[in-house]
A protein has these predicted regions:
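Short amphipathic alpha-helical segments
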Residues: 3, 29, 167, 200, ...
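Short, flexible turn/loop "capping" segments at secondary-structure junctions
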Residues: 162, 196, 255-258, 319-323
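Short, well-ordered beta-strand elements within core beta-sheets of diverse protein domains
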Residues: 204-213, 261-269, 327-331
Length: 345
């Protein structure tokens, strides 16, 4: 009720309005916004796990999440097994009697592996686990909660805000779980203090109004460039290409009108070539050499030395993350054919 907002770190009207909008988008009962994506993800895992518990996680995830699970939660007695999330038999084999959480990204960063959310949900139910999905790469394109995920997280910094001027995160889930996170006595979101600033919340809510239009354009442009890059003989990874190993799976899960998303990768063979190409593109004003994504301009980076740099080199190699890999977040260019011609020139 109005008048009950006693203390801004607990709650504010702007934060609650944004949370409700995001819950409606993801099809969950409610949501809790946070100061960053990591400020959303870390309390979820700490709320679900105690000392002695175990997590099974995808091996290809955002570097910060990987570092949190690999290096930080171990201090608290929480162990994680990293697996190839695309192989359900491997995932199942990693589950122990101490496992509490299955963790993945719907489309992984940066290799764009696609998680079988329905299959993972079946496993989670079989072993009484919580399936937590980071949906940052595919808002609107994929709806994890409708496919069986228990909890859906986002970095709002990326596509949802869309203008690279704000940091934020969200946890979407049941009213009961969100209440637990917000509990003033033992709620991880409440006590760890990653409160979103109310002005940020109002700003993101404003930008959300164009998300449906933006995602369609990101997807259209990315699909066009992926086709062209592949035809040019570049090793191109994009879920919308039939050559992508999970193309059919993505097709089955997707909300068709929003396409296959705005993220693609190409492998140019070496870090030198990757840097050369990225500098050339920046020089031609075709985008920015930057590690964020979901911006209205195209962004590109070499993940091995940026967003996945927390992952040790030998593990990067094992998961197929090579030096020559360039990750693209394709922008909202009005004439993507012209952009492609300028890239080629």
């Amino acid at each position: 009720a109005d008048g009950c907002y006693l203390y801004s770190p607990h709650s504010t009207p702007s934060n609650l309005y944004l949370g409700e909008a995001l819950a409606a988008m993801e099809g969950t009962e409610t949501a809790n916004v946070a100061a960053s994506g990591m400020g959303a993800i870390t309390p979820v895992l700490l709320q679900l796990c105690n000392a002695g518990d175990h997590i099974v996680s995808s091996r290809t995830i955002y570097g910060g999440t990987y570092a949190f699970l690999k290096n930080f939660t171990t201090r608290l007695g929480i162990e994680t097994t990293f697996v190839d999330i695309t192989k359900l038999d491997v995932v199942e084999a990693a589950i122990t009697d101490k496992t509490k959480v299955l963790y993945c990204e719907s489309v992984s960063n940066p290799l764009l592996e696609v998680a079988d959310i329905k299959g993972l949900s079946t496993l989670a139910k079989k072993y009484n686990l919580k399936l937590v999905v980071d949906n940052t790469f595919s808002p609107l394109s994929i709806s994890p909660a409708k496919l069986g995920a228990d909890i859906v997280c986002h970095s709002l910094t990326k596509f949802i805000n869309g203008s690279s001027d704000t940091v934020g995160g969200v946890v979407c889930g049941t009213q009961e779980f969100i209440n637990d996170l917000r509990n003033v006595n033992d709620g991880a979101s409440m006590l760890l203090g990653s409160t979103m600033d109310s002005l940020r919340a109002a700003s993101i809510l404003k930008n959300m109004r164009t998300l449906h239009i933006r995602m369609k354009q990101h997807s259209f442009n990315a699909a066009f460039l992926a086709d062209k890059f592949q035809a040019d003989g570049l090793k191109t990874v994009y879920p919308g290409l039939e050559s992508h190993p999970s193309h059919q799976l993505f097709k089955k899960m997707m909300n068709k009108e929003y396409g296959f998303g705005g993220m693609l990768t190409i492998d140019v063979g070496s870090l030198e070539k990757a840097n050369e190409l990225m500098e050339l593109m920046q020089h031609k004003n075709l985008g920015y050499l930057a590690v964020s994504l979901g911006f209205y301009k195209t962004l590109f980076s070499a993940p091995g030395s940026s967003t996945s740099s927390e992952i040790p080199e030998e593990e990067q190699v094992a998961m197929g993350l090579t030096d020559g890999l360039i990750r693209f977040s394709i922008g909202l260019d009005n004439n993507i054919e012209r952009t492609y011609k300028m890239m080629k020139a």
